[in-house]
Amino acid sequence: MKNLIIALLITFKGYSQQLNRTNDGYTEVVEVELSKKEIHQKLNEWVAVNYKSANSVVQLNTEDKLIVKGNFALSLSVTKYTFPYRINNTLTFSIRDNKYKIDLAPTGISSEGKSLSSLSLINRFIKSKLLSKEEYLVLNDETARKSFASMGYSEKKIEKSMKTLSRYNKTDYEDYLKNKANWDNAINSTFKSIKDYLNKSKTEEDW
């Protein structure tokens, strides 16, 4: 597990995007040798290439702003099992001459086509640093209690549920480390895909 923690720390430091001011998403300003019009065109091309139906995901498309609502796949581990999720998110592109800003904000989570009631499952991943085991367990405890309370559980039932939950959480921190790595890679891949597409030279596009 020590090697996994070290790898995560090294990987996270290599990311260009940062948490936004409200700590609920990611942001990055990218400088390019392109006009505002060229940036706008390439961003629209990227959306068309990466989404099944660009028309259904684009919420706003003006010369200086492009807003896209979509989702990406994310696998999360729980003990020895891995479950597929879809992370709904809003991508906002702000455009100027020679630079653009990417804002990515997760807005929801679903599993097998069903929306989950809360973002608490992934909020633990939107952090500027890797949580220590102690920090994670405190956050996990708070999240679980809030979840049970939102389901109308009494204090007595919450305590009973917490005891039951603790018996199944022996690998919880290790799961967090794996899931955090998957999360960070998914976010980083999205930003990298956008930047790589806009950095394509005209020579690469010639045919």
Regions found by a protein language model. Give the residues of each.
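Ser/Thr-rich, low-complexity intrinsically disordered terminal regions
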Residues: Q17-W207
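Bacterial Sec-dependent N-terminal signal peptides
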Residues: M1-R21, I194
